């Protein structure tokens, strides 16, 4: 079932990508390059294949009115103050999009939405090309609101898609990043190309809710989703044990119930100053009142609950959930 879903989505995205390229070429031929702006926005926001294709961003950079579209001047000095790269790691449906959007609203941080940083790094794309593509993705993804999978991630009055001064650059592709590292662990050595520290952010949701939501969204069994969840946890443990990298664990329920303390801790862990009250209040306005408890949508096999309960005990960063009743 899952393979059929992926094949259907790929086919849909592939033909949409080809149609977009045809329209772009046509507009260029008739000397109407500005008409391509909405096409670029749709490619980045609505088509996963286009969004994760580095050539999409190269094409955008060639547009005559490129600066007017992204409203950021990426000159030779733009990256001079860059101090860190951040990458999200974890499991899908855990709150990465929310945390990525909150960070992107900070005046010194730009976060791309699912550019798939690690894939491009592995394929030999230059550090400069990846960095520029992150900026373009962030700028375009915030056009006409920052909506994704039915949720609105816009933070009113803040700096999503723009910066005062760029100090931290990152990509939100938690599950995809882990898949690449699991299959090609040597990719971690390629991060040296950026000449700044690389830090990982691991957003943690209640494992049962996370597994249930993934099973629901992908129409798979709870057992299949649980096995995938703990495969990712194994990779995260290896990254945590690698002293080359800092890993910041962010509990989604802490973000919801203690937003100021959690955001202060996260921002300062990136060696930035404590965020302003205006920023914190804007971020709090985007948070849910409580975490979604998707686990109660299912009737669980006691053997599976026992399996998950035992696996949770293997991971220090999941210790909060070790003795919590289901």
Regions found by a protein language model. Give the residues of each.
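Glycine-rich, histidine-containing beta strand-loop boundary motifs that form or position
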Residues: 92, 101, 113-115, 202-204
